[in-house]
């Protein structure tokens, strides 16, 4: 299990290490650069996706508030791991945003898929049987964020306006 880029010479256990390496090697970017950073995010197995430090061991099985009768302590632990991986992913995204905050930059963030983590049935991962509204909600609805730096907003107000106008339009990440 490793994160990778065309730039790095070693695998990384955690996304934050990949991001640090990327910024160290690519700090001076050319004027027009497209960088794609593919993160592990909260991918199964979520307990492997974040450093188990005091900062990121934020959620526990006891902090899971879901009340399904079939939810076991072990399932609650898996939900907590997923929540901790999400918390860590937020920190990683914050690191990326802060890096480009003063640049003329646009960042697009999206997931390749969702994960079902005991949301409505005793199931974890991506199982599309039976296909229905809950499967679509938990496995196919994904975050899609477009962030523009202040410098970009000032230089390209027409593009920013078009982005804002598209906020509630449907989109698909399938290509």
Describe these PLM feature segments.
Residues 1-175:
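Catalytic domains that recognize anionic headgroups
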């Amino acid at each position: 299990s490793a994160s990778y880029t065309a730039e790095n010479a070693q695998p990384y256990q955690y996304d934050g290490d990949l991001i640090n390496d990327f910024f160290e090697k690519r700090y001076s970017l050319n004027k027009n650069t497209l960088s794609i950073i593919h993160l592990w995010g909260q991918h199964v197995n979520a307990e492997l996706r974040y450093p188990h430090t005091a900062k990121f061991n934020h959620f526990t099985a006891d902090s899971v508030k879901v009340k399904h009768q079939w939810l076991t302590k072990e399932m609650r632990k898996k939900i907590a791991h997923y929540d901790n991986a999400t918390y860590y992913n937020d920190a990683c995204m914050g690191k990326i945003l802060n890096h480009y905050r003063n640049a003329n930059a646009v960042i697009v963030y999206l997931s390749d898929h969702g994960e079902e983590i005991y949301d409505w049935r005793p199931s974890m991962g991506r199982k599309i049987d039976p296909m229905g509204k809950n499967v679509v909600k938990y496995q196919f609805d994904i975050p899609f964020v477009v962030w523009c730096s202040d410098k970009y907003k000032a230089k390209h107000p027409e593009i920013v306006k078009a982005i804002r106008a598209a906020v509630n339009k449907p989109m698909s990440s399938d290509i």
